Structures are given as C-alpha cells and as structure tokens.
C-alpha cells in the first residue's frame, strides 16, 4: 500500500508523490510568540513532528521548515500591556517554545526561520506583486488585490461573494476591494519598523510565510501544514500571494490540517479565554503522556479536552511500558526453568508480531492514522503478555522471537515519538524545572523581605552551577549559562 494523504486542496485522499523522489519539503506554520503555547497550539507541533518522523522512517529525506512569527499585532499589543520591548518579548517566548517542544519530544525543525530576520525576502516579494499588478500602495500601506487572482478561494472553497466578516481583515474604506489584505503596514509611533520602498513599516501576517517558505523550499514544494483555523484566511492568502508572485501552481502539492482541541465543544483559543497552557497541563501530566493523548485521535478529528482522557492515555502508555519491561525481564532471565509451553503459543505471538508490523504501516499509510497505529502496539503487547504469563521455559526460538518483538516495540513507538523506556529524561527535566521554580520563589520571598544575603546566596550558588537568574519586570527567570 502506498502512502495516501487527505489534501485539503482537493478535498480527498491522494497518493503521496513528492516533487523530487526520496525528498520531501514541508512547511508548517509555527507559533506567534507572544505567550506560552496552549494545548491547541501544541497539537500541530506533535502532529507534524510525527508525520516527519514517519516520512523519514519510510526512507524520505525531509526538509522541515517551521517558522516563528515574531512580528505581529498581537505581539505589539501584549508587549505594550506588560511594558516590554516587543522584539525582546518575542525572543523570550521563542525560548519558552523550545522548552515546551522538548517536553513533548518534538524534534527541532530543519530550520526555524523568524520573520524579523527575513525582511529583505518579504520586501522583495511584495515588490514583485506590485510590479505584476497584484498589489497596490495606499498611503504607506501595501495591499494585495484579491480580484487580481482568479483562483482565490480554491483552498477554503469560498468565493468572493461568500466571504464573511470575522477573519483578519483591515478596515480601510479606500481599499479597492473590502477583502484586500495588507502585505505591508505603514509605521506607527512606538512600533517596530523597517525601511521599504513604501516607507518605514512592517509586514502583514500572510506574506511572512510565503516569503520564508519560498526561500527555503522554492516556488513549489510538497507539504504545507497547520491547524484547520489557518485554512482561511491565512493559507488561502498565502496561496494567492505566492502563486501570483511566482506564476507557479500549486504552491504546495498537499495541504494538511489538524483538527481543533475543544473545551465543551468550543475551539480552545486565547481569544475565547477557554485555554490551558501546556505548562499548566505539564504540572499534572508528563509530556510523553500528553503526546500519547494527542496521537490517540486521528489528526484531522477534533479532541474535546478532558482530564479523564489524559488519565486514560497515562494508563495506556503504562500498559505498553509494562509489556516492554516484562519482555526485558524475560530475556534477562536464564529461561531454563519452568513447564513446557502449550503448543501453538509461540506461533500465535509470531503471527501477531507480523500483523502488528503490517498493520502499523497500513495505518500510517492511510493518512497518518496514529490512533489505529497505536492499536497495533496494544494488540502486540496483549499477545506478548499472554506469551509470558505462566513462567514457561524459554527456548532459543522463544528468545529470538521476544527479541524481535522488543525491537518492533521500540521501532514503532519511536516513529510516533513515544519513549517506552519510561521517559526518564523528560521526568528529569520536569524535576529540574520544579526545583528551579521553587528556588526562584524562595529567592523572590527573600527579596520581598529585603533579605538580600539569602537572595544573593541563591543567585551566586546557582551561578557556580552554570545557571543564571535574570530579574525582569515580569519576574525572575533562569537559563543555563
């Protein structure tokens, strides 16, 4: 069976054929760095990390680009609220993102481009759109002319007549069309700005991803991913400006979108105030459990957040780890004592082992069905537990089969980014974070009481251990020197 993926652009499953045999170019929209990520933000991180892992597992070289939007209206607004420089605040939350991603065992992308480092590419792309008549300048702003792109709406299925209010639309009565969107925004006092042919300003939201994906993956690449909330207007506008600029269509061959995480059937979002930061959830559940929880549902299906489902994921992960441990213990034992094994038991385990490998591949080849893939691991674990129950003597053939089963557990779980060894490293990281937060709290209390000697002793002692405490208007934070 060949890999088939659901393509939002065609609204059907298609056989996956990359532009270049053996190589996949993938761009995924990353976070806007103005706050800690919430569970809804974490889902695409885990989903596309898993997709990348599987593509590499089956032999592809994957060039994975995930950006950081470090210039945006939300960043500027939040920075004003807390009295911090927007560029510095965005950089701080980039570092916090890396910590959260590590807790979920999300590997770094091949490249993590930042908007602030790609102004030349963004300005050049806007210039081409203006030259081709797809964009126009208006009092220091530059807008994309939606009617100039005849295929507008092909991703979301919306026509110009059907477009509704509620998207990120700039209100400007002078625009040629109400839905024309900003490529460049003229500078405002106190906001970050860059020089351009249209005066000082900063880029609009959509052009940023178009410029960065083009720089690192070219005019046409294989996979563009993100949450379903980005289909319109963000990804629709990306297609319009990219294809209008380059004349190449499609910009991305396959568009993949993960489903929402909901709370009481409403999308989890910062704007609705119904979100839980990943940091909050990590205080109750380890990162590997959260990852397991997110992969227990097909990536395109919604997940309604519920602690009981996280608890079920924790128990499920522990069952797999217990099975792995029992196999290890059996292989470590001499295996010479015990009654003779009932006839057909080894053959049954071997049959399940082969079925698990085949079923896992078929599940992942069917639009990355991680929920079904996990069920293959559970089926194998159940049969392995039955095989080991009863303390029967292990023949050399039994031991060889158990070794193969153990290797398959590790291999397939690894494809999903799940560590069956117990997540010791993640546990250690959580312990360190907890201890550091405790020490910072004690130091803050000492400073409040003007006990400078204790506060300085904590700071200096940590410095000797290679840990630096930084005091900021938002409180103390720590980092490795």
Swiss-Prot record:
Compartments reported by the entry: Cytoplasm
GO terms (BP aspect): cysteinyl-tRNA aminoacylation
Positions occupied by motif 'HIGH' region: 31-41
Cofactor note: Binds 1 zinc ion per subunit.
Cellular component GO terms, alphabetical: cytosol
Reaction it catalyzes: tRNA(Cys) + L-cysteine + ATP = L-cysteinyl-tRNA(Cys) + AMP + diphosphate
Binding-site list for ATP: 270
Residues annotated for Zn(2+) binding in this entry: 29, 209, 234, 238
EC numbers, comma separated: 6.1.1.16
Known partners and oligomeric status: Monomer.
Name used for this protein in its record: Cysteine--tRNA ligase
Species per Swiss-Prot/TrEMBL record: Heliobacterium modesticaldum (strain ATCC 51547 / Ice1)
